[in-house]
Amino acid sequence: MEQHRLCYISRNYYNLTSAGNKAKTDNEDTLMEMGAANLGLHRTVHDSKILAFFLDLAGIIRTCFLLRKGDVLFLQYPVKKYFSFLCDVARRKGAKTVSLIHDLGSFRRKKLSIQKEISRLSHSDYIIASNENMKSWLLAHGLEKPIGSLGLFDYRSLSFHEPQASSSDTTLNPTIVYAGALSMRKNSFLVELTKSLSAWSLTIVGNKEGLRGLEDNPHVTYRGFLPSEEFISHVDADFGLVWDGDSLDTCSGEYGNYLRLNSPHKVSFNLRAGLPVIVWKESAVAPIIKKYGCGIAVGSLKELDNILPRLSQEDYSDMQERARQMAMRLNQGYFLKEALRIATSSM
């Protein structure tokens, strides 16, 4: 089989802490580990929009000169302004493009029509959807390009949480942690949860000033903001919760509905900390969590009042070990490597 040179384009990032930027830079690190060639400039971190524009433009121009016939150019979609252009340049030079979707602007933010997004994606030779649900959605809406799926976004970190052995039964008083940016638009369900929670304990990691109406509850602990590396190495919880919207009974609203299609970076973040995750059963990641046995999928958070007491210590320990194994996979770039192996084997 003909050997193709795998290439990518590093760029400027405004920061390395946001979920989107972290996922992209982790992928760049995996590509570098795989021996891929960076045709752009070295990765930079500047918050100046003007400087970022010229740095990214210089990287794009450099790529156009260095790209060769037979290359496979890996793109992280969306690529601001240059996606269709890069795909067309690659085609004219006899190279192929493989594009990993991080976000669909037509589904959540409605920044463009579905037809326009499908048309834009169709410039690429091969698409890697975030997961199988997104893959099915794209095919149902007219995408005719070869397509695979990622599953979960990898999560690389220097830190790793090594759970301490305990003589107590975790299932008697489980603690669930919810970490992330807090806002009424994204996770107001937490307000309702603090009013009614009594069967288990909740730790909220984030700036609670973003949520109005949070109530004092002996079962709820507020930790404030924690850097990601500190969270991963020191989190004291039994499960990580991934839930969006304003309801305890379902994931609703703009962010909640998007869970049907995307693979939240928060899932990978919690798993990297060695935490089994609790996810919505209608989310795109639920089948993955079930497949690997590293968490629980529920239709409503109210179900936890019955599920958690019935979870034996043996079952929890097995789930925790599977989460630990998943943490190692995520740190090694397993999901991207596998998706790229499948993509390039078809070229």
Where are these regions (language model features)?
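A charged, aromatic-enriched C-terminal amphipathic alpha-helix characteristic of glycosyltransferases
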Residues: 167, 299-346
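Membrane-proximal helix-turn-helix segments that form the acceptor-binding/catalytic region
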Residues: 61-68, 89-93, 108-127
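A short, active-site helix/loop in glycosyltransferases that binds the activated sugar's phosphate group
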Residues: 109-112, 123-147
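Active-site proximal beta-strand in glycosyltransferases
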Residues: 72-74, 90-107
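A short acidic/histidine/glycine-rich donor-binding loop in glycosyltransferase catalytic cores
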Residues: 292-298
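Conserved catalytic-core segment of nucleotide-activated headgroup transferases in glycan assembly
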Residues: 156-233
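Nucleotide-sugar-dependent
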Residues: 232-273, 279-282, 286-287
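N-terminal pre-catalytic "stem/leader" segment of glycosyltransferase-like enzymes
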Residues: 1-85, 93, 282-285
